[in-house]
Amino acid sequence: MAKRVKRAGRKREKKHVERGIAHIHSTFNNTIVTITDPAGNTIAWASAGTVGFKGSRKSTPFAAQMAAESAAKAAMDHGMRTVDVYVKGPGAGREAAIRALQAAGLEVSLIKDVTPIPHNGCRPPKRRRV
């Protein structure tokens, strides 16, 4: 049987970034929080799924809160203190994620809604009949 060779994977170096941007992508099914440096390089990210929620529980505000908390802790390990928050999407976890970032100890200096709005683009999905 072939032996497994352990490759020395390079350890991710800690970037020391004081100021960053928190991108909150909130859909009807999930919330993804990505924290980047001002140049756009990802420092930390988390989603409702990576925090441990499955199925319809991912779309709850509490799941968004936990995802934002997890991403904020990882970003603060890199020395981050202040963030600008860009929110995209119509989901339930928008406000909860912003509050969680503040509660985790990050100072929120700006909140901006960057939800893309079509100028009569694609046809929307048909209405649900339950």
UniProtKB/Swiss-Prot annotation:
Presence of the UniProt keyword NADP in the record: no
Keyword Mitochondrion attributed: no
GO terms assigned for molecular function: rRNA binding; structural constituent of ribosome
UniProt-recorded name of the protein: Small ribosomal subunit protein uS11
GO biological processes: translation
Quaternary state and interactors: Part of the 30S ribosomal subunit. Interacts with proteins S7 and S18. Binds to IF-3.
Pfam family, one: Ribosomal_S11
Protein family per UniProt: Belongs to the universal ribosomal protein uS11 family.
Gene3D superfamilies: Ribosomal protein S11
InterPro entries: Ribosomal_uS11 (IPR001971), Ribosomal_uS11_bac-type (IPR019981), Ribosomal_uS11_CS (IPR018102), Ribosomal_uS11_sf (IPR036967)
GO cellular component terms given for this protein: ribonucleoprotein complex; ribosome
The protein's role, per its UniProt record: Located on the platform of the 30S subunit, it bridges several disparate RNA helices of the 16S rRNA. Forms part of the Shine-Dalgarno cleft in the 70S ribosome.
Keywords, sorted A to Z: Ribonucleoprotein, Ribosomal protein, RNA-binding, rRNA-binding
Transmembrane segments: none
Span of the signal peptide: none
Organism from which the protein derives: Caldanaerobacter subterraneus subsp. tengcongensis (strain DSM 15242 / JCM 11007 / NBRC 100824 / MB4) (Thermoanaerobacter tengcongensis)
